[in-house]
Amino acid sequence: EEDVEQAISMIRKAQKPFIFVGGGAVISNASEELRAFAKKIQAPVADSLMGKGAYDGTDELYTGMVGMHGTKTSNFGITEADLLIVVGARFSDRVTGNASKFAKNAKILQIDIDRAEINKNIHVDARIIGDAKVILRKLNARLDPINHDEWIAHIERMKDMYPLRYDKSVLTGPFIIQTINEMTKGDAVIVTEVGQHQMWAAQYYEYRYPRSLLTSGGLGTMGYGLGAAIGAKMGCKDKTVINIAGDGCFRMNMNEIAT
């Protein structure tokens, strides 16, 4: 309870809060509470690869992924923030880059169920250990709505200045992913293998729901996608399931077609 009080004090004092969401928010089924929290404190939201879908990728507060494969808005936003609220993310090197320069202007509040993740890769100023869904519900109950209109307007300007770009004169991976997004209206289950196509799938598809992206983001296991897609279709028979694969990954486990 003392940690919750400290977090509330930090949130109330912040002028430029930013929320960073990882796979822990998906595991804890915290999407509803996360959305309410972001709206209440009027903070932009970015995610990691494994956090995709925890927050609606079409929402106005969403800024995209963080890190080496992230958007400029997310990365610049975190650099400018005075408070970074991290929900269920482990600060991998793909996210932080040079750890000594990550979120250098911000106090960091980490929410995680695993005590071992606290201060492991990045030093934090405060932490709350527990289930993200439960903790966010507590914070929502204790906080009044906070206005950060100027901060959000600044983030919107960055979105306009730094959109994701690709060459539209030729057939490219980003164009294909974006077309799939338009055709499925963001309502499919996307499965990926590992490689550049995996990053395109994370960047150019708008994930609106948790568990709508199935990908091997920790160990990065090539050959994961085909079997995972078959399993996803068996579990979600009413959903369109699309496996996005490179030739090398596909050949590793193409024997799954025999299933």
State where each predicted segment sits.
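Conformationally flexible catalytic loops at phosphate/diphosphate-handling active centers
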Residues: 1-13
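Glycine-rich phosphate/diphosphate-binding loops and the adjacent beta-loop-alpha structural elements
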Residues: 15-28, 163
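Short glycine-rich anion-binding loops that position phosphate/pyrophosphate groups of nucleotides
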Residues: 23-26, 51, 89-92, 195-197
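Glycine-rich phosphate/diphosphate-binding loop of Rossmann-like nucleotide-binding domains
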Residues: 26-32, 36-39
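Glycine-rich, acidic loop regions that bind phosphate or pyrophosphate groups
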Residues: 51-154
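Thiamine diphosphate
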Residues: 73-75, 80-83, 88-92, 199-259
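Active-site diphosphate/adenylate-binding microenvironment
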Residues: 154-233
